[in-house]
Amino acid sequence: MTRLGKPTGPRPGFSREDVVEAALALGVADFTLTAVAERLGVAVSGLYRTISSREDLLIACLERIAARMSLSRTGVTWQEVIRAHAMSLWALLERYPGLAGVIMSVPWAHQLFAAPLAQAHQDLIDRGLDGEDAGVLLDFVGDTVIATHAQVEVMRSPITRSRTLSSPGATDDAVPGGHRADLTGLEEARRFATTAGESPMPAVLSPDDSWIGRGGLDRKIEIIIRGVEASR
């Protein structure tokens, strides 16, 4: 909710940039105004001298992240350009955990990346794709990279056992001291896979270490590229 009226009183001892960096340090998906204020050592009300709302701060965070997206423009072919774009986007998602989820869940979030997307779109056109194909390719690859990273984040993170005890074969294991032994998402997926019985997943789709690496991203991108090549 936007705060109405002009803030009064002395100028704050911190800048809007300081507030943005504090929010990013807490996590673009997780920050709260209370946590940001605590990190800066000020009252929440003091933040409203530099921002108008949490949404305003999220916009500023996404603008900062987009400005830090490094696009390689050295590719000779459109195939090289789209591979480089996918890797640049992946690197950005690695740098800012939770960003994939924000882009997927906040309807306008992707619009803050208009500048790098426009540049990538033009680079594809300059290397032989028409505008529509270039746009669809960027959208397809972007969706693939973002969705893959979101799932990889789940597989890397601890899963609270109480959320999964209803699944087949689940037990309320505990470690010394009475605390539940949380598993990572990958470990939980592997545990679940052992209970599949007569309906196991195909080996190529079964949990493995790639699920906490790049999630088969490179192969997915190559399949997309081959599809575009075949349609031309």
Functional labels for PLM-detected ranges:
Residues 18, 56, 84, 115, ...:
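Amphipathic alpha-helical interaction segments
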Residues 64-69:
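Short, basic, alpha-helical segments at the C-terminal edge of helix-turn-helix-like DNA-binding modules
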Residues 27-28, 41-42, 48-58, 98:
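HTH DNA-binding helix-turn interface
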Residues 6-35, 39, 63:
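Short, amphipathic alpha-helix enriched in basic
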Residues 104-140, 182-199, 215:
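Amphipathic alpha-helical packing segments from all-alpha helical-bundle domains
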Residues 70-115, 131-134, 138-141:
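Hydrophobic alpha-helical connector segments
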Residues 1-2, 154-232:
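C-terminal peripheral helix-coil segments that are non-catalytic and often amphipathic
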